[in-house]
Amino acid sequence: MKYSPHKYQTYATDFILEHPVSAVFLDMGLGKSVITLTAIFDLCLDSFLVRKVLVIAPLRVAADTWPCEIEKWDHLRGLTYSVAVGSEAQRKAALLQRVSVYIINRENVQWLVEDSGLPFDYDMVVIDELSSFKSYQAKRFRALLKVRPRVKRIVGLTGTPSSNGLMDLWAEFRVLDMGRRLGRFITRYR
């Protein structure tokens, strides 16, 4: 399918390309995935600034939506991907493939970082549904925070950045910018 982006989509793609730490807060159905994939395509296959991208998403979105979006759009032809869901053996096999984009469900972030035995050598991380990282006490948050300094580029995607109020924002932004905007410690933010 031919991609004819709206102005806001072009703006968001350009923002991701120009800012190594970015977030796209758009309602469902407004094209967060294609916006991000367009930027990934450019970073991986045009400017060669990124070699490996990790997309973290809810299980169904990781298994179905991201692969469908990559296959759907003509301008993304050539962008290779692997979906790392399922059993441990299936996830490892998917993560060992030589592709540009690795898609994993958020429940397996801790496994990937701490237990998989694979190096965390992703240049770019995309967190689809950033609000699922709102708890600073969650294992997935802590695991991702450990490897965050190794990541050159990160993008957070969500339609509901503060689903339960402003306290939810701290952990989401801590993972994105390592505490630059809202501080490194939750007690100070409170």
Feature map (PLM): residue ranges:
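PAPS/PAP-binding and catalytic site of the sulfotransferase fold
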Residues: 37, 69, 165-176
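SF2 helicase/translocase NTPase motor core
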Residues: 1-26, 30-140, 146-150, 181-190
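Short, functionally important structural connectors and interaction interfaces within domains
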Residues: 20, 139, 158, 167-168
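Short charge-dense sequence patches
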Residues: 93, 123-127, 159-169
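Conserved helicase ATPase motor motifs in RecA-like P-loop NTPase domains
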Residues: 28-29, 151-167, 174
